[in-house]
C-alpha cells in the first residue's frame, strides 16, 4: 500500500510517498507543487494529512468525511497558522486523487493520554467546559516516532521506557513519555505555549499581554502577529530565526538569542521531567534537535540537576546515542521521520 503523507508546517510543506508494508520512502519533496508530485507517482492508495490541531473531537486518525471536515473547520481558530493549510490541501488532493482514501491524522492525538492534572488549566469551570479550554499538546507524530526509534536504539521495548523528548524546529516543544505514552508536554491549548521558538514567543506572562491591550499599546492583530511571527530567535536577535545563521554570525545579539533559547528549552525539560519517576534517556529531534550540535550540547550540558551531562558527539550521520560511553543518562539525536508515523497510522486506519 502506497501512502502519500502531507505534512504542512508553519513555513513548509513536506511530501513523502511511503510503502506502508516496510515503511520505505519511495519519493519525497519539499515543495508547494503538490500536483506535480502526485502526478509522478504510479499509485497512491491512501493520503495521510497531518492536522496540527484536532480540537476536542478529532482524537485519532480518521477518514476525511464531510462531518470530519466540519470538525476541522471548528478547530481552525485554534491553530490559524496551520489548520487552513490542511483544509486547502485536503480540497486540492481530493480533486487530484479522488480514488484515494484521505485520512486526517491529528498531531494532538498522541497527547490524549495526558493525565487530567497535566491537561487542566487552573481556570473557572464555567470557562473550561463550555469552551474546551485544556492542554492539547502538539508534535505528536514526531514524539511517537522518537519514542519508537529511541526504543530500537536502546534495545528496550517502548513500554519499558521513560523518555524526555525535545522536538526543536520552527515550532519547539518537549514531552515526557512514560511507558510509551505522553504524560506531560510543554505546548497547551495552542502551539504558542511553552518553549521559545524560532519566530514564536512561547510562554510569556499573560498579565503583560493584557497590559499591552488594556493600555492600547497593541491591537489584538498586532499582538498575534508579533507573538507568532516576530518573536523567538528572530525577535531577540534581530538577525535570523535560523540557529545556523546565529551560530555562524557570532555577534552579541546572536549569542544572547541562542542563550535565552537554550535556557528556555532546559527549563521546559526540567519542568516536564517532574512527571516522570525516572529518566531513561533524553532525545533530541526536529531540524534543530537533529542538526544543531551546539544547541544539543548547551541544553544537555545544563541539565546536571537531572543527571544529564554534555560532552556529546557532534556527528550526525545517522540516528544514534550521542552521549559518551558510560553516561548516567544516554542522550540521543534522531532525524524526525513524521512521514513514517503518518503512513503507519493512516494504513492502520483503513485496514
Q: Could you describe each region identified by the protein language model?
A:
Residues 280-303:
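Glycine-rich phosphate-binding loops at beta-strand->alpha-helix junctions
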Residues 3-37:
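Short glycine-rich, Thr/Ser-proximal phosphate-binding strand/loop in the N-terminal lobe
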Residues 225, 232-236, 243-276:
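Adenine-nucleotide phosphate-binding core of ATP-dependent small-molecule kinases
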Residues 113-215:
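Glycine-rich phosphate-binding loop of actin/hexokinase-like ATP-binding domains
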Residues 2-5, 46-48, 103, 163-167:
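Short glycine-aspartate micro-motif
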Residues 35-45, 150-157, 269-280:
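Phosphate/pyrophosphate-binding loops at sites that engage ATP/ADP/AMP, CoA/4′-phosphopantetheine
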Residues 40-86, 100-103, 108-121:
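Short beta-strand-loop/turn "lid" adjacent to the catalytic site in phosphate-handling enzymes
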Residues 319-351:
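Structural signal for terminal/edge beta-strands and the immediately following C-terminal loop/tail
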Amino acid at each position: 500500500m502506497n501512502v502519500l503523507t502531507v505534512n504542512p508546517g508553519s513555513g513548509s510543506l513536506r511530501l513523502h510517498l511511503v510503502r506502508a508494508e516496510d515503511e520505505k520512502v519511495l519519493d519525497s519533496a519539499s515543495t508547494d507543487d503538490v500536483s506535480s508530485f502526485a502526478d509522478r507517482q504510479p499509485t497512491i492508495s491512501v493520503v495521510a494529512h497531518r492536522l496540527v490541531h484536532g480540537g476536542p473531537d478529532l482524537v485519532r486518525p480518521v477518514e476525511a468525511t464531510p462531518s470530519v471536515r466540519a470538525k476541522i473547520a471548528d478547530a481552525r481558530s485554534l491553530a490559524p497558522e496551520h489548520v487552513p493549510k490542511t483544509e486547502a490541501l485536503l480540497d486540492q488532493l481530493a480533486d487530484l486523487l479522488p480514488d484515494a482514501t484521505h485520512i486526517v491524522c491529528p498531531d494532538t492525538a498522541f497527547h490524549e493520554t495526558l493525565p487530567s492534572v497535566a491537561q487542566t488549566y487552573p481556570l473557572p469551570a464555567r470557562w473550561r467546559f463550555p469552551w474546551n479550554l485544556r492542554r492539547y499538546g502538539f508534535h505528536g507524530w514526531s514524539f511517537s516516532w522518537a519514542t519508537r526509534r529511541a526504543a530500537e536504539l536502546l534495545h528496550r521495548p517502548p513500554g519499558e521506557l521513560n523518555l524526555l523528548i525535545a522536538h526543536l524546529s520552527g515550532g519547539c516543544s518537549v514531552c515526557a513519555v512514560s511507558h510509551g505514552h505522553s504524560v506531560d508536554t510543554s505546548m497547551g491549548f495552542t502551539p504558542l505555549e511553552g518553549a521559545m521558538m524560532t519566530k514564536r514567543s512561547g510562554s510569556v506572562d499573560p498579565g503583560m499581554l493584557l497590559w499591552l491591550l488594556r493600555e492600547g499599546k497593541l491591537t489584538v492583530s498586532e499582538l498575534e502577529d508579533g507573538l507568532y511571527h516576530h518573536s523567538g530567535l528572530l525577535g531577540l536577535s534581530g538577525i535570523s530565526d535560523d540557529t545556523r545563521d546565529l551560530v555562524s554570525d557570532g555577534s552579541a545579539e546572536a549569542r544572547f538569542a541562542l542563550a535565552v533559547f537554550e535556557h528556555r528549552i532546559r527549563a521546559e525539560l526540567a519542568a516536564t521531567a517532574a512527571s516522570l519517576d525516572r529518566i531513561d534517556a533524553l532525545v533530541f529531534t526536529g531540524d534543530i534537535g537533529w542538526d544543531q550540535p551546539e544547541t544539543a550540547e548547551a541544553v544537555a550540558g545544563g541539565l546536571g540537576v537531572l543527571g544529564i551531562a554534555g560532552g556529546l558527539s557532534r556527528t550526525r550521520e545517522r540516528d544514534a546515542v550521542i552521549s559518551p560511553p558510560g553516561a548516567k543518562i544516554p542522550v540521543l539525536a534522531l532525524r524526525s521521520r513524521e512521514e513514517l508515523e503518518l503512513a503507519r497510522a493512516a494504513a492502520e486506519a483503513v485496514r
